[in-house]
Amino acid sequence: MKSIVFVALFGLALLAVVCSASEDAHKELLKEVVRAMVVDKTDAVQAGERECRWYLGGCSQDGDCCKHLQCHSNYEWCIWDGTFSK
């Protein structure tokens, strides 16, 4: 009788340890998914910013340059167009 109770308690303890480890693994997986979502969002923002050329970046027309920049006709790089805004 005592051995059956001991085996049952040991089984319950083992089950609790396995469930706890599974829960920790689930939390780590959730953290990785959230981290991946944040990184993907950051990459998407950077990709949108990369669609234009920055100051002194090479260009062939004004549309290649970022906001407040224009393409210099002789040197073909983006320079400030002289405008201000917020």
Swiss-Prot record:
Propeptide feature ranges: 22-50
Annotated GO MF terms: ion channel inhibitor activity; toxin activity
GO cellular component, one term: extracellular region
Organism superkingdom: Eukaryota
KW Disulfide bond (keyword) present: yes
Annotated signal peptide: 1-21
Expression sites (tissue/organ): Expressed by the venom gland.
Main localization (coarse): secreted
Disulfide bond positions: C52-C66, C59-C71, C65-C78
UniProt-annotated location(s): Secreted
Keyword tags: Disulfide bond, Ion channel impairing toxin, Knottin, Secreted, Signal, Toxin
Role, per record: Ion channel inhibitor.
Family: Belongs to the neurotoxin 10 (Hwtx-1) family. 17 (Hntx-9) subfamily.
Domain statement: The presence of a 'disulfide through disulfide knot' structurally defines this protein as a knottin.
Protein's name according to its UniProt entry: Omega-theraphotoxin-Hhn1f 4
Lineage: Eukaryota, Metazoa, Ecdysozoa, Arthropoda, Chelicerata
